Amino acid sequence: KEIIEGVKTVFCGPIWVRLSATAYDETGTQNTLQDYQQIAKWLEELGVACLDISTGGLMDVKPNIPIYGGYQATFSAQIKQAVSIPVTAVGLLHNPELGEYLLQTGQADLIQVGRGLIRNVNRLADAAQSLHDHDFQVYNNSYKRGQVR
């Protein structure tokens, strides 16, 4: 609460908060999904505009689960059930169709792609083409000549 209120004193824009919904810590010392759903509700009450849901990364623990495209999206979907503000999905969302599926099925409101954009600066244009989005326009005009038509 103190952090959000402090940020609001110096920043008037929308505040996004990243939650790591699990640390994959099998010792039983981490918060539960229900704990994170409650935290998400509190953040919404404080006026947070969006929740960026990820997993792992807080501890040096390798997940003891299968890693596949969209493996973190179930956490986004479960946090989304607890709040009415937008919730993002992340994590190996290399396939534009998978991202679109998560959006269309209500498991997330936004898809975030980090490493995919580092690997391919044309990622958004490629995704738009793959999804047959004929209305997509490149924001930076210098990239237009590189678009596949």
Write out the residue ranges for each language-model feature.
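Flavin-dependent oxidoreductase catalytic cores
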Residues: 1-149
